[in-house]
């Protein structure tokens, strides 16, 4: 089947609505919407929930941009895109909870298509979701990865292991020699065997995110915590900022190509701290995190 960008766009708009409704149902606070237009073509809907009952900040962003030609930075690596008009669309979200026992989570699903008359379109899907705990709970990690594995199974037994490894490899801070969190799924350049199959997988990932995340939120959101746990959460959030500004391809591409800065940086935690040469006490729950986030098979 020929790629249907309109069908993908409708799914993404509905996905943004659904995820916002689900997060509001858990939190009680409402999202504030900021609609924007891109000068070169397209626009989006950025939605942010701030200082809610559960979430310190949750951002759920939809964007759909298009243009007559790709930027040179993109065609340098993919010469087949030169001279083509393009459309890029996606939903991207990050949730930063108040409670340090509730992990931060991130998800993204996206579609890209470039066309020119008389030629087959070039298209692909990408996306995934990943979890960044501050305090490790095995049952949470197992639930997260089991949900990821189960949504992948209808698409082949090798899908989950492949995209889990890709996620582990991608969300890695080389300058710290550590993982950002416990991973999940990451895929890109997906265009085989056909559009329908790839679109169905992208939909499964988009819908699977809240199935994976919200039960963990419900389990941890009422746990008591104090200043020590909060300080550790803010310190570990520093790793999130470091990854996004130093290594994340999407953030760098968006900033380098004149994307909407407010929406791109919506993933940033509202409060964060750094501490020179911080070392958690041996045997403490904080010290245990470095071992917990090491790559392993959770299911």
Curated annotation (Swiss-Prot):
Positions that bind substrate: 92, 108-110, 258-260
EC number(s) given by UniProt: 1.3.3.3
SUPFAM superfamilies found in the cross-reference section: Coproporphyrinogen III oxidase
Amino-acid positions noted as binding Mn(2+) in the UniProt annotation, renumbered to this chain: 96, 106, 145, 175
Active-site residue list: 106
Pathway: Porphyrin-containing compound metabolism; protoporphyrin-IX biosynthesis; protoporphyrinogen-IX from coproporphyrinogen-III (O2 route): step 1/1
Marked site: Important for dimerization: 175
GO BP: any one term: protoporphyrinogen IX biosynthetic process
Region (Important for dimerization): 240-275
Subcellular location: Cytoplasm
Cofactor or coenzyme needed: Mn(2+)
Domain of life: Bacteria
Coiled coil feature spans: none
GO molecular function annotation: coproporphyrinogen oxidase activity; manganese ion binding; protein homodimerization activity
Enzyme class: oxidoreductase
Family, per entry: Belongs to the aerobic coproporphyrinogen-III oxidase family.
Function: Involved in the heme biosynthesis. Catalyzes the aerobic oxidative decarboxylation of propionate groups of rings A and B of coproporphyrinogen-III to yield the vinyl groups in protoporphyrinogen-IX.
Assembly with partners or alone: Homodimer.
Protein name, entry field: Oxygen-dependent coproporphyrinogen-III oxidase
Source species of the chain: Escherichia coli O157:H7
Lineage: Bacteria, Pseudomonadati, Pseudomonadota, Gammaproteobacteria, Enterobacterales
